[in-house]
Curated annotation (Swiss-Prot):
Source organism of the structure: Ehrlichia canis (strain Jake)
Cofactor note: Binds 1 divalent metal cation per subunit.
Top-level taxonomic group: Bacteria
HAMAP family registered for this protein in UniProt: IspF
Protein name, per record: 2-C-methyl-D-erythritol 2,4-cyclodiphosphate synthase
Gene transcribed to yield this protein: ispF
Length: 173
């Protein structure tokens, strides 16, 4: 295989994650889910091996993909008890560190949370600030938005939550 003489200046990665909600109804004032690092009250819990943060999982996957380091499942497999109930912050920081080891920094990221409930947009700015602080970049370089599936499919039936992320990594000078 022919090697590049120079590393590419820009690399793009795409990430995706989905988790189902459990089937138990909880008191939403005492129950929360974590999305993009922010706790949001919700009447269902996420079923996951780690903390189930679909936003941070998708972003982690996008960063790892951009710099050619595989996927979140390869680095933090849900078959390994080491990652049971792990905070997704750790996954994201590790992905950022891997990008830096390869000579890249995260330029910007766009994350979309897909669900009928809970409502994400009231928390989007806090999510952006949380992620930016975690990976040490300007808040203007992180975007979090939300959409629904217009009540179609398992997400439309409120059976789960999903996220997609795209990230641009740039070669460090």
């Amino acid at each position: 295989m022919k090697q590049h003489i120079n590393k590419p200046t820009f690399k793009v990665g795409i990430g995706y994650d989905v988790h189902k909600f459990d089937n138990i109804e909880y008191d939403a004032t005492n129950t929360f889910i974590t999305i993009c690092g922010i706790k949001i009250n919700h009447h269902k819990k996420i079923v996951a091996h780690s903390d189930g943060d679909v936003g941070l999982h998708a972003l982690t996957d996008a960063i790892l993909g951009a710099v050619g380091c595989g996927s979140i499942g390869q680095h933090f497999p849900n078959t390994d008890n080491k990652w049971k109930d792990a905070k997704s912050d750790y996954f994201l920081i590790e992905a950022k560190n891997k990008a830096q080891e390869k000579g890249y920094y995260i330029s910007n990221a766009d994350i979309i949370i897909i669900c009928e409930q809970p409502k994400i947009m009231p928390h989007a700015l806090k999510m952006q600030e949380y992620i930016a602080n975690l990976i040490k970049i300007d808040t203007s370089c992180i975007n979090v938005k939300a959409t629904t599936t217009e009540k179609l499919g398992f997400l439309g039936r409120k059976e789960g939550i999903a996220a997609q992320a795209i990230v641009l990594c740039c070669l460090q000078n």
